[in-house]
Swiss-Prot record:
The protein's name: Small ribosomal subunit protein eS8
CDD domains reported in the protein's UniProt record: Ribosomal_S8e (cd11382)
Species per Swiss-Prot/TrEMBL record: Saccharolobus islandicus (strain M.14.25 / Kamchatka #1) (Sulfolobus islandicus)
Domain of life: Archaea
Gene: rps8e
Pfam families cross-referenced by the UniProt entry: Ribosomal_S8e (PF01201)
Amino acid sequence: MGFYQGPDNRKITGGLKGKHRDKRKYEIGNPSTLTTLSAEDIRTKDRTLGGNFKVRLKYTTTANVLDPATNTAKKVKILEVLETPANKELARRGIIIRGAKIRTEAGLAVVTSRPGQDGVINAVLLKNESQGS
């Protein structure tokens, strides 16, 4: 079943509007990716408009974590998802999105990339709580 993101044919009162055109291909959407932790990395490659591609990260084990103190990045294992400011239900289900706070082997970090669209998890190590593993 497709995800239609165009205008609906209902008025605020609930009545039907007159349909003046058909649905267009650029008005279709996709379900959310909902990246979670797993034993291996699984990515899918979706074609978008203009022949471009989005790499969707379905499952992952690692993140690229930047340490702002030393300005170095390293690939470390993700241990758990602690909280998500967008929705606490996502953190309870272990779903990683942009802005989520994760516990890694290097310490606590905040995700700065969009795993469902970038295909990778980039994060920045938190200063005060880098000892918290």
